[in-house]
Amino acid sequence: MLLLVGCQQVLHPGWPEYKGYKKAPYTVKGTRFVPMSVESALHYKATGIASHYEADGDIGAIGQKLYRHKRYAAHRTLPLPCTVRITCHRTGKSCIVRVADRGPYIRGRLIDVGTKVAKELGFYERGLDTVTVEVISVGDGK
C-alpha cells in the first residue's frame, strides 16, 4: 500500500492538459486495431504479460514526450490517455501509471511499461512478468 500511495503523489505533475480521448482505429504492420469504448475501458481488468520498453525522449501516441525517469505505459486498445493500476504477480508490487502510447505489438503481451515502472514493479532485469492491469480513469478523469 505504501508504494501505491507513493505512485499517486507524482501521478499528474508535468502531464499536459488533455481534453478528450484518442480512440480512433489504427493499423500497424497490416493489422488493424480498434480501441475499446470509454464505457468498456472503465470496467477493464486483465491479466497477462507486461514487457519493458524504453522510449527516452520519444513522442507517445498522444503527443506526450516519454522519458525513462517518468511513469508511462503502452496498450493496444485502451482509449488514450487513461490511468491504470498495474500489479506484478511475482513481486506483489503495484503502481499507478498513465497509458500514453500504443503497443505492445508482440503476440502474447498485454502492456508495455517504461523503465521507471518496470523497476518499481520489480521486473526491470527480467524484462517480462505477469501483471494485472486495471483501469482507474479515462481521459482527463472527469
Where does each model-flagged region fall?
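Sec-dependent bacterial lipoprotein signal peptides
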Residues: 1-7
